[in-house]
Structures are given as C-alpha cells and as structure tokens.
A protein has these predicted regions:
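An N-terminal-biased, well-structured beta-alpha scaffold segment characteristic
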Residues: 2-92, 213-215
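C-terminal helix-to-coil terminal segments
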Residues: 19, 92-105, 119, 260-319
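A short, aliphatic-rich alpha-helical micro-motif
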Residues: 41-42, 60-63, 138, 191-193, ...
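Phosphate-binding beta-alpha-beta segment of Rossmann-like dinucleotide-binding domains, i.e.
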Residues: 89, 94-142
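NAD(P)-binding Rossmann-fold cofactor-contacting core
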Residues: 162-178
Length: 319
C-alpha cells in the first residue's frame, strides 16, 4: 500500500520534524512555492497545506488526487473556489487563529487615534511640548462592526472593558455574545450615522465586493473613525480616496487595500487622515504552530472518517 502524501507550501521549521514523527505512516514534503512541486508528486498528493499564490485552477487540475486543502490563512478569496467545489475538495482555513492578533491591532488603532499618539509623536519629532493636548475617552462611544465572525467576536471581547456600545452587522442578523445589538446588512444604512467607530471585518465574497459606496460614507458621521482589517475590496479604491480627501469621515486606519501591494505613488500615501499598515495585522510568530495544531486535529478526523469539521469553509459562501 502506498502511503498518503501530504505536501506543504510553507516551510514550517522544527514543526516539520514533529509532524513527520507524529505521523510515521504518512509522507510529508515541504516546499517554499507551488512551482517547486514535481509533476509526479502533484499526481499523488492528497492533502495540501497551503498558503501560496500559485494555487490556481491549473495547479488544482494538475493534482487529480487532491482531497483536502488546509489553507494557512483566513481569506480564501484568491483560491479557485469553483474548481475546488466541482472536485468536492475539502477546504479549511485558519479563521479564529489570527483573530487574537488582528483584534489587538484593532484595539491599538482605536487607542492610537483616541489618545492622539500620532500628534504626540509629530510634536516630539518637531520638539514641540504641548501640555494642552487632550485625548478622547472611549466610554459611551458607539462602535459598529461589519461582520460578526471570529475576528469581530474577539474584537468585542477586547473592547468590552472600555464600556462602549457595540453593534454588529451580519448577513443573518443572529445574536452573538458581547454585542449590544446585531442587525442585517439591509439595516446597515440606518445605523451608520450613529457610529463613532466603524470596523470592517468582512471577508471578500460576491456579496461584500464593493459593498460600501460613497453614499455610505456620506451617511457616516464626519467625526467617524473607519478601520478596515477585512478585505480592501469592500470599497472601490478611487471612491475611498475621494471620501477621505473630501473629509467625509475624520480618519481611516487601513490594513487592507483593493490592490496590494500599494504602489509607491498611490494617492492614499498623500492623505493626512489615513494611517496605513501593510496587511500585517494577521502576521503572528505563533501562527505556524497554532495552525498546525488545528491541522493535526483535522488530520486525525480525516484519517479516521475521511472528513474534517473544524474551520471548514463553506464553498458556496466563500468563508
């Protein structure tokens, strides 16, 4: 009997040895890129541990025995979901694992803004000592979070001690712990102007693509803080630039963009009411080990039942 072949598109350091030791009957192969995998291995591999832009339609078609992709990231929008669905390939992601790190970034963005840390830093650089500078308090502020998944829920946990009012917007409008209220996407517009802070955590799907338009930003309170840690495609880039340059909102913290990486002459770099991070909020030293623990739990299920449950992506919804 040939043993099952598992290919990782990530080098996992010492984790590689422990995987090989924990599963002596399986064959593990580790590569840096999808293009490095030899054709004969593509023919035989059954499980792919991935995070690589090379996993496209052609790649999947070249792997006739592929049964499960364990994606070491949350967003799966760059994968050819239609082919994966057609072939009945199982897809899992790392949602929830990155939520701790991303939610801490969201909290730091809010505090950075409300406590005017940026102004203090600019003052320091210019040797200006301004003892009248006054930070804003978070208590009683109203927060609206687009999406109520694991990232939003973890963010709510961190924000709770600050005594804010937190509203969620989701497809179903179903109640989730920690939120004061949750409404459906249809109700979004009636809640936008009440929010002091708006946080997007939505994944990219057909429904969320360019979900926000200029109209939404016109409804928002002009003192509003907008944070995007979901996907950049929630709003068309040229509309985002227009909205910010016309000061329809006070400030934006953006970690994701419609076109990544940002081009050096992108207009967003010229605006003073934007704080940019380079899609780094999910970077985490612990991600490989946490994601591999999840992979091992799922692998045990796969070996026993030929199926996995935890963090399975609904291929019809795209998350």
């Amino acid at each position: 009997v040939k043993s099952m072949k598992i290919v990782s598109l990530k080098r996992l350091g010492e984790i590689e040895t422990s995987l090989i030791n924990n599963y002596p009957d399986l064959e593990f192969y580790f590569f840096k890129n999808a293009v490095d995998i030899p054709t004969e291995l593509k023919d035989e591999l059954e499980i792919l541990i991935g995070y690589d832009s090379g996993v496209d339609k052609n790649f999947i078609n070249a792997c006739p025995n592929l049964k499960w992709i364990s994606w070491y990231a949350t967003g799966v929008n760059n994968l050819p979901l239609d082919v994966i669905k057609e072939r009945n390939i199982i897809l899992t992601n790392t949602r929830g694992i990155q939520a701790k790190q991303v939610s801490e970034f969201v909290l730091s963005f809010i505090l950075d803004d409300y406590k005017k840390m940026r102004t203090s830093y600019v003052n320091q650089v210019n040797k200006v000592y301004d003892s009248k500078l006054t930070g804003k308090r978070l208590s009683d502020e109203k927060v609206l979070i687009l999406g109520t998944g694991s990232l939003a829920q973890q963010t709510v946990k961190l924000l709770k001690p600050f005594e804010l009012e937190i509203i969620g917007i989701s497809k179903s409008g179903h109640h989730k712990d920690g939120f004061d209220n949750i409404y459906t996407i249809e109700d979004l517009e009636s809640h936008l102007n009440k929010a002091d802070i708006i946080i997007n955590t939505l994944p990219e799907t057909q429904e969320t693509y360019h979900l926000l338009s200029e109209r939404h930003f016109k409804i928002m309170n002009d003192k509003c803080l907008f944070i995007n840690v979901g996907r950049g495609t929630i709003i068309e880039e040229k509309i985002l630039i227009k909205v910010l340059s016309h000061n329809l909102i006070r400030h934006a913290y953006l970690d994701v963009f419609e076109n990544e990486p940002l081009d050096a002459n992108n207009e967003l770099y010229k605006l003073d009411n934007v704080t940019i991070t380079a899609h780094i909020t999910g970077n985490d030293k612990n991600i490989k080990s946490d994601a591999t623990k999840l992979f091992e739990r799922n692998l045990d299920d796969f070996l026993n039942k030929n199926d996995v449950i935890e963090n399975r992506v609904d291929l019809y919804k795209g998350y």
